[in-house]
A protein has these predicted regions:
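Mid/C-terminal beta-alpha module of Rossmann-like enzyme folds, strongest
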Residues: 132-187, 211
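A short C-terminal helix-loop "cap" of Rossmann-like NAD(P)-dependent dehydrogenase/epimerase domains
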Residues: 55-57, 91, 104-114, 164-175
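NAD(P)-dependent short-chain dehydrogenase/reductase
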Residues: 76-128, 132
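Residue-level signal for the nucleotide or nucleotide-sugar donor/cofactor binding architecture
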Residues: 11, 118-121, 150, 190, ...
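Catalytic helix-loop patch of NAD(P)-dependent Rossmann-fold dehydrogenases
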Residues: 3-18, 37-88, 95
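A short helix->loop->beta-strand "cap" motif at the edges of active sites that frequently abuts
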Residues: 25-29
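Non-catalytic, hydrophobic alpha-helical segments
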Residues: 126, 130, 144, 155, ...
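Amphipathic terminal alpha-helices
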Residues: 203-217
Length: 217
């Protein structure tokens, strides 16, 4: 039986929903930085292909970790506040800073890499977009990932090319990864059609990652 993580439920479910209720009551616009790590590839969403991505209306289908289960419930509940809450789904956030929260820094410090094509979010691309959405009091759900897919190996190959030519890494399978992790990892392709209609200037993920690596420090 899976142990209930009280902090997870408090921080990722009760907190956001209570904030949504309070802001709705007071007429205050609320922007919530949620996650797209509530989906996984399946028969309708083929592995590693940029087709039939998960849309803003898609229901969570990933239950591989307690974090994603709780976040999935929160995401669906926020659809009840579409007139007052902006729910932004981000994934695997990337910046040009060498810090432990940066996805690039994380994977360059892993002993082994399970390389899977994924949708990801290059945060500096979205800072002005988030501010614009807040200023215009936009509401509803929006997939906030750069268009396209990129794998861990593609990022590490660029890292070796641009940052450290001596960098090396080893790969292992999803099955091997699952044996050593407490929870499974979400892997998916997010549909960004809605985002691209609103902000057609947004860069594809591989171009933005390369830009981050050129400034990585």
């Amino acid at each position: 039986m899976r142990r209930i993580n009280v902090d997870n439920i408090r921080d990722n479910l009760f907190g956001p929903i209570n904030m949504s209720l309070i802001c709705k009551k007071l007429g205050v616009h609320y922007t919530y930085l949620g996650t797209g790590c509530i989906f996984e590839y399946d028969n309708k969403h083929p592995y590693g292909e940029e087709v039939n991505g998960f849309t803003e209306e898609s229901k969570p289908n990933f239950i591989g970790s307690s974090y994603s289960i709780v976040k999935g419930f929160t995401d669906q509940l926020l659809h009840n506040f579409e007139d007052s809450v902006l729910n932004l789904r981000i994934r695997m956030p990337i910046t040009d800073e060498n810090n432990p929260r940066n996805f690039i820094t994380k994977i360059t410090n892993y002993e082994k890499i399970c390389s899977i094509p994924n949708s990801m979010t290059v945060l500096p691309d979205f800072y002005p977009i988030i501010v614009d959405l807040m200023e215009r009091r936009k509401t509803g759900t929006l997939n906030l990932t750069n268009p396209g897919l990129i794998s861990h190996n593609q990022i590490l190959e660029m890292f070796r090319e641009i940052v450290n030519p001596d960098f090396k890494w080893k790969n292992f399978s999803v099955e091997e990864q699952n044996q050593i992790l407490a929870g499974k990892r979400s892997n998916n392709f997010m549909d960004t059609s809605k985002l691209e209609k609103m902000y057609p200037q947004i860069s594809r993920i591989e171009d933005s990652v390369r830009k981050m690596l050129l400034n990585y420090k």
